[in-house]
Amino acid sequence: MLFKKIRGLFSNDLSIDLGTANTLIYVKRQGIVLDEPSVVAIRQDRVGTLKSIAAVGKEAKLMLGRTPKSIVAIRPMKDGVIADFFVTEKMLQYFIKQVHSGNFMRPSPRVLVCVPAGATQVERRAIKESAIGAGAREVYLIEEPMAAAIGAKLPVSTAVGSMVIDIGGGTTEVAVISLNGIVYSSSVRIGGDRFDEAIISYVRRTFGSVIGEPTAERIKQEIGSAYIQEGDEIKEMEVHGHNLAEGAPRSFTLTSRDVLEAIQQPLNGIVAAVRTALEECQPEHAADIFERGMVLTGGGALLRNIDILLSKESGVPVIIAEDPLTCVARGGGEALEMIDMHGGDIFSDEI
């Protein structure tokens, strides 16, 4: 215990956004020090037993869909929570070590991890135990919408109601925040991954071709749009896939309209969650939100025109936060500082 405390003196306090698609780590006075895909490549023996970790993060993501039989590239997080405990722990261990690469001692940091608002107690305990197993000496949990709101510079400590929509890789969190607490929250298991899956299904159905996750993600980023207005440029992209009928590679052209048609269902799920939040929040908070608007955070906020879609469907102004991808990790870092100043009970529902 004493040795762990001594190691702690040589470790940074970390805010970790442990996401389905990416893991970000924020360090006080240094900012975002790590932004890596939440992917681990593992070596297996002939019966499928784990032998060793082959790669983590960017290097492992490059292996998705390209590995030999002896190596499997997996995502240990699903829908914002742990799907593979052992691999998540190894991934966290690797990332924490990366952040402390100059240290001569094994790191033992104080860690704050951001969790989905809809995570169960069992899922929260798994995240906490995984962080401790990865070397953390002390672990705090904070709900992602609260961290996102702090990172987006919303006035979370005042009585004014602030609404945040955090669209991550696995989940979309919709929350109303006031007086350092979440007064309304809902979490739908729809995010960037669902958009990618919808594009893969659409290509298979419409063009009879198979594409992988990395290609679907590239399509979404390059020509994807949540709403097409009159006068908008219709982007096109040549896509290479594997034709099912011919059993050979084939190229075809996709447009922004195709992508919009493909992702319509997950978009409808996010719109429905936002409408429900506006219907169910307290009248005074609703008035604040209609006056001040809703704030979009997370990687999903980068999907072209998603702010326009949500504004048109809800009748409320929508603002995309500055640097939406890092809002949760940065907000978690600020939350750690608030805990130091006011104690762990400042976010009584989360910590």
Curated annotation (Swiss-Prot):
Signal sequence segment: none
Single GO molecular function: ATP binding
GO cellular component, one term: cytoplasm
Binding site for ATP: 20-22, 169-171, 217-220, 299-302
Cited InterPro entries: ATPase_NBD, MreB, MreB_MamK-like
SUPFAM superfamilies: Actin-like ATPase domain
Keywords annotated in UniProt: ATP-binding, Cell shape, Cytoplasm, Nucleotide-binding
Compartmental location: Cytoplasm
NCBIfam families noted in UniProt: mreB, PRK13927.1
The protein, known as: Cell shape-determining protein MreB
Organism: Haemophilus influenzae (strain ATCC 51907 / DSM 11121 / KW20 / Rd)
Gene (name only): mreB
